[in-house]
Amino acid sequence: MEKSFTHIEAGRARMVDISEKNDVSRLARAAGEIVLSAETLEKIRTGTVEKGNVFATARVAAVLAVKKTPETIPMCHQIPITGIDVDFEIGEEAVSAVVEVRTVGKTGVEMEALTGVSSALLTVWDMVKSAEKDEIGNYPHTLIRNIRVLEKLKGKA
C-alpha cells in the first residue's frame, strides 16, 4: 500500500484538520549533535567560553524554539506545550542535545522537539564560533549532524 502525504491535497499544501481527534497525552524526544574542536569542548567543560554559559543559553533557545515552532514550520498546529526538558552531554568530539516535549493534545510534538534540538545546536555554534573559526573565518570542522526523533509516544506519555 502506497503512503500518501496528509498535508498535500490535489497538489497544494494545506493544514490537516485535527478537530475530530481526541486530546491524549503525547511525548516526543529528539536528539542531535554538534562536532567541535577539542579546545572548544574543553572551554565548554570548564565554563570559559567568552560569550557565557553555553548550555544555559542553548537551553533557553530550545525552549523558545519549541514554543514558536508553528511560526516557522508552516503546517504545524498551535498546540499547548505542557513540558519541555533539554539535556546536553559533552562527548569526545561533540556536544549532544536531547529535547523532550510533552503535550495533551490532538497531534504529536515531534516537530517541536526537532525544532528545539536544531535551535539548541545552532545556539551552541553561535556561542563558540569565535573559538571554532580558522584563520580566514571559516568553520572547517564544525558540523551539526544526526538530528532525529528518538521516541514518539501517544496515550502514555
Swiss-Prot record:
Q: Would I find Cell division among this entry's keywords?
A: no
Documented EC number(s): 4.6.1.17
> Catalytic activity, per the record?
(8S)-3',8-cyclo-7,8-dihydroguanosine 5'-triphosphate = cyclic pyranopterin phosphate + diphosphate
- Would you say which domain of life the source belongs to? Archaea
InterPro entries, alphabetically? Mo_CF_biosynth-C_arc, MoaC, MoaC_sf, MoCo_biosynth_MoaA/MoaC, Mopterin_CF_biosynth-C_dom
Q: Can you name one GO molecular function term for this protein?
A: cyclic pyranopterin monophosphate synthase activity
Identify the keywords attached in UniProt to this record, alphabetized.
Lyase, Molybdenum cofactor biosynthesis
UniProt-annotated catalytic positions: D126
**What family is it from?**
Belongs to the MoaC family.
What is this protein's record name? Answer: Probable cyclic pyranopterin monophosphate synthase
What organism is this sequence from?
A: Methanosarcina mazei (strain ATCC BAA-159 / DSM 3647 / Goe1 / Go1 / JCM 11833 / OCM 88)
